[in-house]
Regions:
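Anionic N-terminal interaction surfaces
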Residues: 2-135
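Residue-level detector of short, conserved catalytic/binding motifs and their immediate flanks
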Residues: 141
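Acidic, Ser/Thr- and proline-rich intrinsically disordered linker/docking segments
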Residues: 3-27, 31, 38, 63, ...
Length: 238
């Protein structure tokens, strides 16, 4: 986990400083817990409207005016899309020889064309298509993705839906500039931070927020045993 801290000299929140690492190892504390604890700290400041107290994280990404980089780390994403357009080119052939040879040749060609047609139809069906591994910069307003061949941003305000589909996986649904629906699944140690920011700012009635299930069960107790207080952010503030 990259070094992350929240706050200034007063009211510092650093998820790694107060943890008793020896005890933490005994209870199975991992890098994932570090990221979850940091996310809890960010959410605590977010709901209190005190994001200005958060220490900005270093980033190579050009930020917008007054944008605050909260985290940056590895990310792999997959796009829900077809890998083909359904087109295929039938192959024609000419065969000469005995009747049985010509019949066999045409049968083989027909089977090959049938296979091409089926493959084209299969490639037309949408599926999750992984992109090259890259990284993500998470701010209070968006997530910026980049890999060797592509860069793009998803703004929380532009989302139609968000869901935390695994401990380190988040799914976004939104519309591109022409208005076409898009779906993106992201695997990243910062997936829970992406979800928390998007949900708290744009989806306050999200079932994972209302149920408190966006945080792992027993996480607060785990923090207590490890010697680190956890902000009370499991449930939305009344």
């Amino acid at each position: 986990m990259s070094e992350v801290a929240i706050g200034g000299a007063e009211g510092m929140f650093d998820p790694g400083v107060e943890i008793d690492r020896l005890i933490a190892e005994q209870i199975g504390w991992s890098w994932f817990d570090d990221h979850v604890l940091y996310t809890c700290g960010v959410v605590d400041f977010l709901v209190k409207k005190q994001l200005a107290r958060i220490r900005a994280q270093a980033t190579r990404i050009r930020l917008e005016a007054d944008e605050l980089c909260l985290a940056e780390g590895p990310a792999v994403w997959s796009v829900w899309q077809a890998v083909g357009d359904g087109s295929w080119a039938p192959r024609t052939m000419y065969a000469s020889g005995s009747l049985s040879f010509v019949a066999a040749a045409h049968l083989g060609n027909a089977l090959a064309n049938q296979s091409r047609r089926r493959r084209a139809a299969h490639e037309l069906q949408p599926r999750w298509v992984p992109a090259r591994p890259g990284a993500a910069m998470v701010s209070e307003r968006r997530v910026f993705f980049h890999n060797p061949g592509h860069t793009f941003s998803i703004y929380w305000s532009g989302l139609d839906m968000v869901d935390l589909i695994g401990p380190d996986r988040v799914e976004f649904r939104y519309r591109d500039l022409p208005g076409k629906p898009q779906a993106l699944q992201v695997q990243s140690p910062w997936a829970i931070l992406m979800f928390a920011l998007a949900a708290h700012t744009q989806f306050p009635n999200h079932p994972l927020l209302l149920s408190g299930n966006w945080l792992p069960a027993g996480f607060e107790d785990k923090c207590h045993i490890a010697g680190k207080p956890c902000p009370h952010v499991r449930f939305p503030s009344p």
